[in-house]
Amino acid sequence: MSRLPVLLLLQLLVRPGLQAPMTQTTPLKTSWVNCSNMIDEIITHLKQPPLPLLDFNNLNGEDQDILMENNLRRPNLEAFNRAVKSLQNASAIESILKNLLPCLPLATAAPTRHPIHIKDGDWNEFRRKLTFYLKTLENAQAQQTTLSLAIF
């Protein structure tokens, strides 16, 4: 008997689009693939022309600290959700940002500083800060996944 039908069936079972939808009771670990896809999609939109003349990664140390602080992940996402409303042609990013909240872990303590500030209508600043924020989320999730695998 050929193994091809079995392999095709297995492939269909593990494809993300054919799996059961995520629910409130689904652990966040299993939904990270979806979160990673959303982050990648936002970054793709952020790289659309016109590209800024400024360096994407040129953020001051204070902004970097605010964007990397674990307890500010949710307040920072709220700041990006407010800022995206002042931008033109950013509806695709806005809709994805709204769905990103379940990807963020709960804060372990109250924030000790204010969330990131983004100038209204400043596409380049929004793009630089959001790109840094999303890369920080990806790195944190990669570390969490590595720790989880090391435990097992």
UniProtKB/Swiss-Prot annotation:
Family, as annotated: Belongs to the IL-3 family.
GO CC list: extracellular region; extracellular space
Protein name per Swiss-Prot or TrEMBL: Interleukin-3
Tissue: Activated T-cells, mast cells, natural killer cells.
InterPro entries hit by this protein: 4_helix_cytokine-like_core, IL-3
The keyword Signal is annotated on this UniProt entry: yes
Inducing stimuli: Upon activation of the T-cell receptor/CD3 pathway and can be augmented by coactivation of the CD3 and CD28 pathways.
Glycosylation sites: N34, N89
Biological role stated in the UniProt entry: Cytokine secreted predominantly by activated T-lymphocytes as well as mast cells and osteoblastic cells that controls the production and differentiation of hematopoietic progenitor cells into lineage-restricted cells. Also stimulates mature basophils, eosinophils, and monocytes to become functionally activated. In addition, plays an important role in neural cell proliferation and survival. Participates as well in bone homeostasis and inhibits osteoclast differentiation by preventing NF-kappa-B nuclear translocation and activation.
Disulfide bonds: C35-C103
Subcellular location: Secreted
Keyword Glycoprotein: yes
GO BP annotations, alphabetical order: cell surface receptor signaling pathway via STAT; cell-cell signaling; embryonic hemopoiesis; immune response; interleukin-3-mediated signaling pathway; nervous system development; positive regulation of cell population proliferation
Gene Ontology MF annotations: cytokine activity; growth factor activity; interleukin-3 receptor binding
Region forming the signal peptide: 1-19
Quaternary structure annotation from Swiss-Prot or TrEMBL: Interacts with IL3RA.
Keywords assigned: Cytokine, Disulfide bond, Glycoprotein, Growth factor, Secreted, Signal
Organism: Homo sapiens (Human)
